[in-house]
Amino acid sequence: MPRRWRGARRLTRLFQDVIALFTFGCPLFTLELKLGQYFRKGPFHGFQHIHKRFWCVGFASVLMAAFMGIFYNTVMAWSLVYLCYSFADPLPWAEDPISFFYDGVLQSSPSIAEMSGIAWYVLLANVVSWLFVGFALSKGVLSSGKVAYVTATMPYVCIVALLVRGALLPGAGAGVRAYLRVDFAKLAEFDTWARAFNQIFFSLSVALGALVTFGSYRPKSEDYVRDGVLVPVINCATSFTAGFFVFAMLGYISEQKGVEIRELEFSGFALAFIT
């Protein structure tokens, strides 16, 4: 799902993302796949085979992957909390989704100086989420490969369902028009280019060690160049498609609130839960 929507210039950003994809994303994706495929090792020992002092590069990749795993598992815990709440009637977030997310689920404090208590149900959901991860990885690639059949296909089912639902909402057309609006002036701004490259690195999981690990399980005869181009392109196309239902939802919310899309006061991960 696209992470940035502020300013409603995604079509312009698509051009920047494509440039970033083919100049840095695909080459680095292919390089990491080949590194694991050639040495048959994970990131730590794979980089060490290049030079004995490069072990620190592999260690840094594993460390970053651990941090990312903690972050995503927290988001999964929030999703489990919402799943449990979805059985209530009426839905607890129907009236004020923003307050429900920040006050009801996160129980967030006004500032770091005023720490709130532990949200025990979120903690429990986090434990359950980690148990799911442990179960998926319990037998290595034998179990994770089977789980991937579900985790790799279900997002596309959800995207189609959300696209249909978003298209039927009032204000969806305005949201899609904002999504496809072009602002060529943004092409001259360094900040938008930096964000585009950041998005490509983040969405492809480059430099996190995962691609090296995946490559280590691939037969040496498999075409790594084909996969190094095809997978990133599909990833980018999926993100662009997902943007349609995101902006359809934003168009609906902006119409309900009577404000412009760019004036909505939420972004980032909260967007998925508030919309």
Identify the residue ranges that each predicted region occupies.
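Generic alpha-helical transmembrane segments of integral inner-membrane proteins
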Residues: V18, F22-C26, V127-L131, Y156-V160, ...
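Hydrophobic alpha-helical transmembrane segments of multi-pass membrane proteins
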Residues: V18-T23, A60-F71, L124-F132, A194-S205
